[in-house]
């Protein structure tokens, strides 16, 4: 069925291979849970990764200049993915890289692993995708089916939280398990 998307790759991944796409997001979430499970019990509730002191020099400059540009590029790649090359995973990877760059320079600290906002960012994408999939049972006759004529807006509504979840998950995988400050 026509999706209204100009990018055949996105159309295929979100309509005919939707279960694979859902499981891709779930795998990132499970990988983060796996990394977090490596932390000792005493570290639970701490922040992922080592605490980084503020940097000076080129790293600090790049960490101040690049994230706003990377944010725009990452979001553009997600938006452009509906009609051309790009999409949620590529955009999410760029957003994650910008967060990690700012963390490496000591400009931001990751939130504690028990933070509600962090957990919401991690599960929002898979949860929204699953809810849309269940709605497909009632509206389109099968799990993960999209209602005719509404494919593009529904796909974009799925990709927005998926991008957030993928970006958060990839960044947290790089930061590692939580630790308590000494």
Predicted regions located by residue number:
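Alpha-helical transmembrane segments of multi-pass membrane proteins predominantly involved
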Residues: 1-182
């Amino acid at each position: 069925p026509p999706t209204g998307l100009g990018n055949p790759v996105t159309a295929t991944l979100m309509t005919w291979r939707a279960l694979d796409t859902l499981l891709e997001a779930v795998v990132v979430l499970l990988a983060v849970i796996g990394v977090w499970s490596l932390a000792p019990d005493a570290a639970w509730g701490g922040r992922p990764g080592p605490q980084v002191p503020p940097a000076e020099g080129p790293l600090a400059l790049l960490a101040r200049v690049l994230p706003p540009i990377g944010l725009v590029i990452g979001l553009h790649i997600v938006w452009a993915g509906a009609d051309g090359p790009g999409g949620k995973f590529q955009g999410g990877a760029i957003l994650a890289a910008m967060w990690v760059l700012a963390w490496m320079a000591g400009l931001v600290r990751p939130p504690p692993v028990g933070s509600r906002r962090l957990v919401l960012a991690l599960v929002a994408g898979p949860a929204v995708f699953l809810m849309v999939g269940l709605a497909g049972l009632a509206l389109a006759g099968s799990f993960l089916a999209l209602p005719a004529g509404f494919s593009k807006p529904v796909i974009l509504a799925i990709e927005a939280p998926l991008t957030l979840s993928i970006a958060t998950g990839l960044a947290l995988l790089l930061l590692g398990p939580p630790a308590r400050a000494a």
